[in-house]
Amino acid sequence: MIHVEVVYALPTEQVVFKLAVKADQTVQEIIEQSGVLERYPDIDLVVNKVGVFSRNVKLDATIRDKDRIEIYRPLLADPKEIRRKRAAQAKKEAAKK
């Protein structure tokens, strides 16, 4: 048995499920076993990306002892577009001075 964590972060809270699992289980099996899908039914493993310590992994990947499996939420806004808007606003404010 190995020890892993399944983490899901929301804007208002972060939940961590600590589990002892068999070493040959896949990421998907561990996520299903954790109970996070029952607690947060909006998670769709087809849509949501998953990772281990901030590195994207496939659902059929195996994990190691003390790994942290992270379930990522989709981005609500395009980071490039946000930077463009922020730069345009800063340019307008600089022109007013």
Curated annotation (Swiss-Prot):
**InterPro entries assigned:** Mopterin_synth/thiamin_S_b, RnfH, RnfH_sf
Family to which this protein belongs: Belongs to the UPF0125 (RnfH) family.
Indicate what this protein is called per its UniProt record.
Protein RnfH
List the source organism: Aliivibrio salmonicida (strain LFI1238)
